[in-house]
Amino acid sequence: MTPHINAKIGDFYPQCLLCGDPLRVSYIAKKFLQDAKEITNVRNMLGFSGKYKGKGISLMGHGMGIASCTIYVTELIKTYQVKELLRIGTCGAISPKVGLKDIIMAMGASTDSKTNRVRFLNHDLSATPDFELSLRAYQTAKRLGIDLKVGNVFSSDFFYSFETHAFDLMAQYNHLAIEMEAAGLYATAMELSAKALCLCSVSDHLITKEALSPKERVESFDNMIILALEMMS
């Protein structure tokens, strides 16, 4: 047990899917897993363990932003011995290379947060995912006929950004979208010798102002859930 997770040791499988929204975690458990069991609920941040096609897998919410995400990731790795962490979330596109419903694999994560500079003695940290997880995601997407978009993301501390003038510059540097956690997830996994990857479904386009309806968000997210579960099975 940790200050933020009240699961017992052994409740988590070595592979864990992460979502910012705990209700989305519950949705995945009920719709996609067999024998799903709630294993933690501190602060209503839900976690489940169950099976997908006979293989054990866990789910955990992590809240919004790098600070919240890294708390849960640290405790999952250090206390519960989780080895592979796959974040599946939504993002806002900033590049003409991607559109609504596209799934992005974050091959690098820039950030306006100072957390990685603090942990890396004020140097620039290259926040990147695990290669083997990335390869599995790419190969699984090919098998499922999913056109996975690969590029960088920008992990912002601000949901309501005041640096919209920087979107064109980010796109020039092959940043496909903005989200809020990948840079912290990758850095924490690197520090603690775990494997991590972030997949994001485009729910909004910050340049064209297009946005999915609530129904479309669920449908597009389901495709990413299936990709995530298939690559972990």
Swiss-Prot record:
InterPro entries with a match to the protein in the record: DeoD-type (IPR004402), Nucleoside_phosphorylase_CS (IPR018016), Nucleoside_phosphorylase_d (IPR000845), Nucleoside_phosphorylase_sf (IPR035994)
A GO term, aspect molecular function: purine-nucleoside phosphorylase activity
GO biological process, one term: purine nucleoside catabolic process
Reaction(s) this enzyme catalyzes, per UniProt: a purine D-ribonucleoside + phosphate = a purine nucleobase + alpha-D-ribose 1-phosphate; a purine 2'-deoxy-D-ribonucleoside + phosphate = a purine nucleobase + 2-deoxy-alpha-D-ribose 1-phosphate
Active site: D204
Top-level taxon: Bacteria
Binding site for a purine D-ribonucleoside: H4, E179, M180, E181, S203, D204
Marked site: Important for catalytic activity: R217
Ligand binding (phosphate): G20, R24, R43, R87, I88, G89, T90
Enzyme class: transferase
Keywords noted in UniProt: Glycosyltransferase, Transferase
UniProt-listed Enzyme Commission number(s): 2.4.2.1
Cellular component, GO, one term: cytosol
NCBIfam families for this protein: deoD, PRK05819.1
Family per record: Belongs to the PNP/UDP phosphorylase family.
Record function comment: Catalyzes the reversible phosphorolytic breakdown of the N-glycosidic bond in the beta-(deoxy)ribonucleoside molecules, with the formation of the corresponding free purine bases and pentose-1-phosphate.
Subunit structure: Homohexamer; trimer of homodimers.
Name of the protein this chain belongs to: Purine nucleoside phosphorylase DeoD-type
Species assigned in the record: Helicobacter pylori (strain HPAG1)
